[in-house]
Amino acid sequence: MDCSGRCCIFVYKFSSLQTMKFTHFHVHSQYSILDGAASIPGLIEKAKADGQAALALTDHGNMFGIKLFYDTCRQKGIKPILGCEAYVARVSLYNKEKPIDRSGEHLIILAKNLTGYLNLVKLCSTAFCDGFYYRPRIDKTQLEKHHEGLIISSACLGGEIDQ
């Protein structure tokens, strides 16, 4: 279509978009302090109402809601995708003195199988037990060590790519 130098507006019918399949891979619940307020059952009900076949849970730095999320998804016929939005220390998870590593960069980590889930649990445990400095943090060494079965994605404006 030639607009001859004018601003053109294209209108699409939403009915054709309604048949598209969509899954949220970056979702926060009430367990993401200061960033999520939705209850896990509420998130799953909304996904079901929207016709989504799957849904991820990626709370900030923790997996506190994973059991409820998994069980409720299974009851409602939604495929649960287990994950976490991790904080990655720029230098080392053991660095607890420099402000550069105070909060870490955000990274979405999703488990694609049982091995991935076990590695995700290991990463979250390490973040709390060894890497906690203002927030639970991991580092790239830990990611390299426990990467099997995981899908890694940039997160948000707090991620390494956006920084």
Segments (PLM) and residue ranges:
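Phosphodiester-processing cores and adjacent nucleic acid-binding clamps
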Residues: 4, 9-163
